[in-house]
Regions:
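N-terminal glycine/serine-rich phosphate-binding loop of ATP-dependent small-molecule kinases
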Residues: 3-114, 143, 233, 249-257, ...
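Active-site core segments that coordinate phosphate-bearing ligands/cofactors
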Residues: 23-25, 39, 125, 132-196, ...
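Short secondary-structure junction motifs
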Residues: 31, 87-90, 229, 357, ...
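Residues that line or immediately flank small-molecule/substrate-binding pockets and catalytic motifs
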Residues: 51, 97, 120, 238, ...
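Short, conserved phosphate/pyrophosphate- and ester-handling motifs at nucleotide-, phospho-/glycolipid
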Residues: 64, 121, 261
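Short beta-strand-loop/turn "lid" adjacent to the catalytic site in phosphate-handling enzymes
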Residues: 81-119, 145-154, 187-210, 235, ...
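A structural motif corresponding to the C-terminal end of an alpha-helix
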Residues: 223-230
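Short linear loop/turn motifs
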Residues: 231-240, 348-352
Length: 516
């Protein structure tokens, strides 16, 4: 299918009415989705396709880049066919993606040189420790990128590929290899190799991007031994990224919005101003607070990152971020490895079936501890087991562990920013769990707001694309589309809250290999 020529900006009113929908491609850690949004910002239809996880060694996590593509393009094609969409029904495409996950491919053949190294993978821990043994190097990385040196980010993953895949470094030095986070890989494929680009939010997660000057940093590229020719062009989140040109796909749909999943969720929650915050309960757990044009420095192990901006916004907008590595992945572990549940939906009923955890705490440090601890060598543990501990206690402890980790982030973020969060917007798959959100409100002593449409990550990507084309006029129009579905406020006594928090901190302390 083909569509008539259309520009990505400055559309006349008649052109604005040509496309009835915006499609968001939401490429996540465990599945790929295509979501169709109408002008009211409502998800009209969606298709989701899971793909396999690969665990070659303990602490290592990989994806086959072809699985990412087949699941994402398959979801897009199925959505178009199932909804009977003609090419001109679609105004534009927005892309949001799992961040940091690293793919290196041959520019000539389009073939990856190896599996993607996933954001959760810890194989480069020793490399990071060796490179950053000099405190001045670690300080410079943080000052330039806003990030704390960690295997989580892309830089060390690229170096590992160049150092360990036969012929990769030589090919890279000849200019034959391209690096990209998942957004770049999708854009390259959708445009049939015509566009090698990323957006500022994904670039800011590589540990190679100067977030203050808006460019790839030569010192960091040299530190990690990465040829500059591998790097994608960096564009604003709302801008033109080419159009679909891959044979077998709908031709000529503009790709006009790209953002990493957490920045997309911040945008989808309409957190456009300093002090507005959201938490996404996905595979990981991610708390972001918009800090406006100020790149706020953290003394609590949080990172400074770039926020997605609407078209026409002058200057760079920033966010303060804290991340938890295991959130939905912890629930997946309960199902797949322990066999305690058949589906995530069961966790709410089981958690409510007991009055408390019976003193059980789970510290889900399966791939290390994220902010505010940043202990890559910590490992998961369950504390407080007795003969009376049952399945429900362990499931409840897992859900409570998610909430405790978010609490740690909120406390650190408030201290770093000087802003007290009275309200936290929430989204992501696990936000459908009422028990989790009520316990979160209880343990934080804060109000939580959950929108009726919890697919705010995909919505953020759609908003960025639609604002770029004129499908939506401006931020004010988008704000009016926002909705609040449910509000959760604390019901827990202060004494009980502090007892539970003290127990959590004791459990975390027993898993840590790095002491404060």
């Amino acid at each position: 299918m083909a569509r008539g020529p259309r520009g990505a900006k400055g559309l006349a009113e008649g052109d604005r009415l040509m496309g009835r929908y915006v499609i968001a491609l939401d490429q996540g850690t465990t599945s790929s989705r295509a979501v169709l949004f109408d002008r009211a910002g409502r998800p009209v239809a969606s298709v989701q396709r899971p793909f396999p996880q690969i665990y070659p060694q303990p602490g290592w996590v990989e994806h086959d880049p072809h699985d990412i593509l087949s699941s994402q393009l398959g979801a897009l094609t199925e959505l178009l066919v199932s909804e009977g969409l003609a090419p001109d029904d679609v105004d534009s495409i927005g892309i949001t993606n799992q961040r940091e996950t690293t793919i290196v491919w041959n520019r000539l053949t389009g073939e990856p040189v190896c599996n993607a190294i996933v954001w959760q993978c810890r194989r480069t821990t020793e490399m990071i420790e060796r490179l950053c043994a000099d405190p001045e190097v670690a300080r410079r990385i943080t000052a330039t990128t806003g990030l704390i040196p960690d295997p989580y980010f892309s830089a060390s993953k690229i170096k590992w590929i160049l150092d360990n895949v036969a012929g990769a470094r030589e090919a890279a030095e000849r200019g034959e290899l391209a690096f990209g986070t998942v957004d770049s890989w999708l854009i390259w494929t959708l445009t049939y190799g015509r566009v090698h680009a990323t957006d500022v939010t994904n670039a800011s997660r590589t540990m190679l991007y100067d977030i203050h000057n808006g460019c790839w940093d030569e010192y960091l590229l040299d530190l990690f031994g990465i040829p500059a020719s591998m790097m994608p062009e960096v564009r604003p989140s709302a801008s033109s990224f080419g159009e679909t040109s891959n044979p077998g796909l709908v031709q000529g749909i503009p790709i006009c919005g790209v953002a990493g999943d957490q920045q997309a969720a911040l945008f989808g929650q309409c957190c456009f101003k300093a002090g507005m915050a959201k938490n996404t309960y996905g595979t990981g757990c991610f708390l972001l607070m918009h800090t406006g044009h100020e790149a706020c420095e953290s003394s609590h192990g949080l990172v400074t990152t770039i926020a997605a901006s609407a078209p026409g916004v002058e200057g760079t907008e920033y966010a303060l971020e804290g991340s938890v590595f295991m959130a939905g992945a912890l629930v997946q572990w309960l199902r797949d490895e322990l066999g305690l549940i058949e589906s995530p939906a069961q966790t709410e009923t089981l958690a409510k079936s007991v009055p408390d955890t019976g003193g059980v705490y789970i510290v889900p440090a399966f791939t290390g501890l994220g902010a505010p601890y940043w202990d890559a060598e910590a490992r998961g543990a369950i504390f407080g087991l007795t003969r009376g501990t049952g399945r429900a206690h362990i499931v409840r402890a897992a859900l409570e562990a998610l909430a405790y980790q978010v609490l740690d982030l909120v406390v650190a973020m408030e201290e770093d920013s000087g802003i007290t969060l009275s309200t936290l917007n929430v989204d992501g798959g696990a936000s459908a769990n009422d028990f989790l959100l009520q316990f979160q409100a209880d343990i934080m002593d804060r109000i939580l707001k959950r929108p009726r449409n919890t697919e705010t990550t995909a919505l953020g990507a759609a908003y960025l694309a639609g604002l770029q084309t004129g499908f939506w006029r401006d931020l004010e129009e988008i704000r009016r589309l926002g909705d609040i579905g449910d509000v959760f406020s604390t019901k827990m006594a202060s004494k009980r809250r502090h007892e539970l928090i003290d127990g959590w901190h004791e459990a975390v302390g027993r898993t840590r290999t790095r002491r404060p």
